[in-house]
């Protein structure tokens, strides 16, 4: 998760570096290590940027840790440290875990990337997994998810459910990852409801429940009857529940907070990836490299439909999810007509689709989004 705002030039550099790592994956791969043969369990650690709650970014990664422990049993001992701020505190915690003899350390926050790399240089025999990072090293791999794929599917559901033809979107910062999701949501929405539009509120914060709630209330007061968000709490879901409106959950299933309001949940799944990486250390097969996985890889999915969503809408969304998995559907693709931004400029020419490089550097709002980036 991007904890801090990244300036546009830095975003472009990040995209370039991430794509270079993807393209150079075979070259980055290191000679497989010796299989783990210690009599004691392999030690795997996870560092979290916020406290563990019942839903959200950290919850999904904690579920990944639990999946590792459940899958590998006594062969592995997992631990975690929660609520670790990015920066100096992160480096201290990561270094301490390495000194304690952990064999693999997962650091799932963008602001952990540099501290991870710094510690990794001093502990060449420890493997590091920098989740949402983009810089690799001999003992540092990176991974992220194509969250925008789930956003597109959520947009389809929202387009079917809205009655006011207005959706609201509470967003953190206008960085590429957020813009990917906002634009994909809008494209999905308008693919089934061309008259619908999206109003967005920028918070310039990732986790601020009171302001997230206020933004949701503002959007509903402006006519939005379906909401989505790219922030860190359940506040938007709670606001929709309070007002009797609908909302798309992000990160986790949030029906405990919004049992009547939830349309569906866009979730990212880390259990399979984390387990595969820990198992690779156990078997001496761990290699550095980059992964950017989506629905096809099982890293992103939608589901957990709420009670107000008709079965026909559920079936439609799940069918489109299968199309994504099979490669038959691309969120950032144009048909006979080009896709334009909300200033009228062509951003996807007719009969074409964006490359990964272009998706990673999105700096525009698609037609149908009301507002500007700042």
Predicted regions and their residues:
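Positively charged n-region of N-terminal signal peptides that target proteins for export
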Residues: 1-4
């Amino acid at each position: 998760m991007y904890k801090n705002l990244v300036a546009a030039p830095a975003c472009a550099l990040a995209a370039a570096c991430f794509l270079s790592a993807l393209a150079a994956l075979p070259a980055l791969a290191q000679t497989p290590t010796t299989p783990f043969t210690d009599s004691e369990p392999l030690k795997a650690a996870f560092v979290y940027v916020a406290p563990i709650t019942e839903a959200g970014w950290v919850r999904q990664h904690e579920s990944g840790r639990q999946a590792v422990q459940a899958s590998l049993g006594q062969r592995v001992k997992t631990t975690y440290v929660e609520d670790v701020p990015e920066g100096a505190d992160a480096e201290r915690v990561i270094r301490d875990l390495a000194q304690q003899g952990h064999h693999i350390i997962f650091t799932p926050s963008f602001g952990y990337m540099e501290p991870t790399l710094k510690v990794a240089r001093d502990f060449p025999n420890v493997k590091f997994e920098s989740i949402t990072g983009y810089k690799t090293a001999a003992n540092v791999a990176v991974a992220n998810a194509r969250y925008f794929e789930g956003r597109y599917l959520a947009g389809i559901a929202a387009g079917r459910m809205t009655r006011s033809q207005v959706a609201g979107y509470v967003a953190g910062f206008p960085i590429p990852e957020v813009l990917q999701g906002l634009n994909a949501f809008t494209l999905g929405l308008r693919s089934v409801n061309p008259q619908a539009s999206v109003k967005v509120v920028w918070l310039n914060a990732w986790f601020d429940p009171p302001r997230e709630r206020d933004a949701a209330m503002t959007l509903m007061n402006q006519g939005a009857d379906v909401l989505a968000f790219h922030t860190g709490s359940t506040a938007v879901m709670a606001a929709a529940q309070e007002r009797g409106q609908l909302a798309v959950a992000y990160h986790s299933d949030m029906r405990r907070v919004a049992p009547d309001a939830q349309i569906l949940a866009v979730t990212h799944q880390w259990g399979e990836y984390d387990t595969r990486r820990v198992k690779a250390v156990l078997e001496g097969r761990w290699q550095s490299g980059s992964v950017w996985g989506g629905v096809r890889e099982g890293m992103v999915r939608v589901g957990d439909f709420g009670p107000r969503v008709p079965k026909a809408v559920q079936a439609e969304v799940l069918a489109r999810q299968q199309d994504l998995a099979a490669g038959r559907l691309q969120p950032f693709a144009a048909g006979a007509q080009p896709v334009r931004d909300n200033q009228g400029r062509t951003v996807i020419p007719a009969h074409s689709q964006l490359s990964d490089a272009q998706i990673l550097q999105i700096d525009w709002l698609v037609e149908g989004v009301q507002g500007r980036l700042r």
